[in-house]
Amino acid sequence: MKKTDIVLAVAAVGAILYFYLGSSGGQESAHSDVKNDLTAKMVLLLGRDSGGSAAVQGKADVKDSPYFKKVDVYNLKSGGSLLLLEKYKTYQQHTEYTCGPAAALTVVQHFLGNAPDSEMEIAKIMGTHPAGVKDPGTNTRGMSRYFEKKGWTVKNSLKHGSPETYEDFIKFVDDNLKQGVPIMVENVDWGGHWRVIIGHDTMGDSNGMNDVLIVADPYDTTDHSHDGYNIISATRFYYMWFDAHLFREKEKERQWLTAVPPGYDSGKKK
């Protein structure tokens, strides 16, 4: 049997299993781990996923790009008009659908130095799904679940609301960064994508329109420097802070979460 035939056969079996498990009513929770594990393994083992940003590391880099200035974000210092979580380690996702787990992994690294769980271990706890499955990607509930299971203190848009104005958003960002807390955010980038806000620069004035955000991006392939950092317009992000088609209708607007480990002392991160 050809490899393509095997792939199609297993995919068909997977679809049947998903239909059966997904239509079992009250038994849904009992089968959720089976579905999550099945769909993840099908994608990873059968080649239905291109391997995410990690699979093309450096291939889109352009040395001395005339269009994008190279900034050594890792070695930037916070001060003046710039609020920054210094030495923030980035990470590139290994599938096309695990931006949420990959973003969360960087937050764990930020606080603990190393992440005790792998990207796919985090994805399993979060209930992360590939495209074509109910609730694809990782929603805010799933993102929060991982940290809550670890005993971390979690705040999110579902329980605490979201900034209603751009000015409130900037204050929200600054308040967290001053406490050494990165902000995981999901917006319409790539149709729906989790990144982590780790910096904000007012550019030295109160204009607001020229403010920039520095984000850790687990799919960093579009600025000619595959270092895991993006520098983006704060206003542009705020007005594009919604999900395109992945999340449920009531969870599409301005999704975010923060998480800090037990006993976290913000004074140590300032």
Which residues does each PLM region occupy?
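Hydrophobic alpha-helical membrane-insertion segments, chiefly the h-region
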Residues: 12-22
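Cysteine-nucleophile protease catalytic domains, especially the papain-like/related folds used
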Residues: 56-57, 62-161, 244-247, 252-270
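Active-site-adjacent substructure of cysteine-protease-like catalytic cores
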Residues: 162-216
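N-terminal Sec-pathway targeting helices
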Residues: 1-10
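Gly/Ser/Thr-rich helix-start
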Residues: 15, 101, 200
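Noncatalytic regulatory segments and standalone regulatory/sensor domains
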Residues: 34-47, 51, 60-68, 130-131, ...
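Ser/Thr/Pro/Gly-rich low-complexity linker/stalk segments immediately outside membranes or between
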Residues: 24-38
